[in-house]
Amino acid sequence: MADSEVLLELSDIKKEYKKGVPALKGVSLSVNKSEVVVILGPSGCGKSTLLRCINGLEEIQSGEITLQGNVINKDKTKWHLIRQRIGMVFQSYELFDHMTVMQNLLLGPLKVQKRDKKEVTEQAEKLLERVGLLDKKNSYPRELSGGQKQRIAIIRSLCMNPEIMLFDEVTAALDPEMVREVLDVMLELAKEGMTMIIVTHEMEFAKAVADRIVFMDSGEIVETNYPLEFFRNPKTERAKKFLNIFNFEKKDKVESALLI
């Protein structure tokens, strides 16, 4: 459960693509320490762009990104230091195919953070054991399933000891059978108090993991609410329409049965 200390704050974030196409239209959001914020919304609404802006992978045109009281988006030369504090996991894993699992895990802490190899190796092995993949430490990514690769990607970020984790549709490329093993890791992180911002289309997972739901549409935050309230009684028509999409199949089956 989140405490009252604000860890990350976004103030009037605006982002435009080429030709003046707006991606984010003045997004403001505060995230408390140990809070899990799940961002929902239709494809193309700016969810992933927002995460990439937080991590410095996309440049914003105006606004401020504040981490623990310090504005982090004004000095571009410090982004390599800031990214060490903000872990990000993508749907495409981003593992180096020519490196073993352990080599992938050690790369950032050793090359970027200049940490002791023995210390990082012990940390990596503990994390691998925790997710049931210690026996894969000498394997290459090509030898792993999609679910295993995504768990390795999460551990790689954790090895950098981040203050906040960003997850961008991490189950989107997985077979249904592999989705649960990845979501279980994220649920455990939430229980342990990791601050997380999660973009997902897994509605049941969102209900289970979120302290707060943020609904976006067309580059703006349209609605924010507690999970139970959001899913039971969304405040905006746009959110209602979005949630009805996920109820369509069930509704269609019921109506078909009534016609028989």
What are these regions (language model features)?
Residues 5-8, 14-218, 222-223:
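ABC family nucleotide-binding domain
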Residues 224, 228-260:
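C-terminal boundary and immediately downstream tail of ABC-type ATPase nucleotide-binding domains
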Residues 1-14, 251-260:
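ABC-family P-loop ATPase nucleotide-binding domain
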